[in-house]
Amino acid sequence: MIILDTGVLSIVQRGERPAYDHLVARLDVADDEVVVCVVSFEEQMRGWLAYIARSKSSNQQIAAYARLHAMLDDFATRPVVGFDRSAAAEFERMLRLKLRIGTMDLRIAGIALAQDALLLSKNLTDFRKVPGLRVEDWTV
């Protein structure tokens, strides 16, 4: 299993070149299932909801809701891995290690560890602090 973290998923969603081209070239030949996780859904949802809350004009709100809707449609087309008891146990183990990594990234790492999955991320600096986590950047 290959999990796209939120940053890599955003590159896919936006078709951000050249990172998108590098990533897709590797994913196209990968044998493992490619998934996203519910934590990425939460992160993107929170971001769009905050943007909607800050929108002042109808045009801004219309555009923001359209992006929120597009995000929802995108997640509906992808396999999404949840945050279950195994992921929570990994998350709690990492908290005890006092790793200096953001909470959401720790949750994503917990899911990847619990699934014995390869995590694709541009944030190698933080994720490489997690013992046992397999993480690579396929966008370069």
Language-model features: locations:
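Acidic, PIN/NYN-like endoribonuclease modules and their adjacent C-terminal/linker elements
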Residues: M1, A109, L113-V140
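Short, well-structured N-terminal submotif of metal-dependent ribonuclease cores
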Residues: M1-V39, A50-H69
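Alpha-helix capping/helix-boundary segments
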Residues: V8, S40, A87, I108, ...
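Nucleotide phosphate-binding site architecture
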Residues: L9-S10, E42-M45, R128, E136
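Short, flexible helix/strand-to-coil boundary loops that buttress conserved ligand/catalytic motifs
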Residues: Q13-E16, W48, L95, P131, ...
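Short, structured coil segments at secondary-structure junctions
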Residues: A30, A76, V130-P131
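Active-site neighborhoods of divalent-metal-dependent phosphate/nucleic-acid chemistry enzymes
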Residues: E33, R46-I52, D73-L120
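Residues at the C-termini of beta-strands that transition into short coil/loop
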Residues: V38-V39, D84, N123, T139
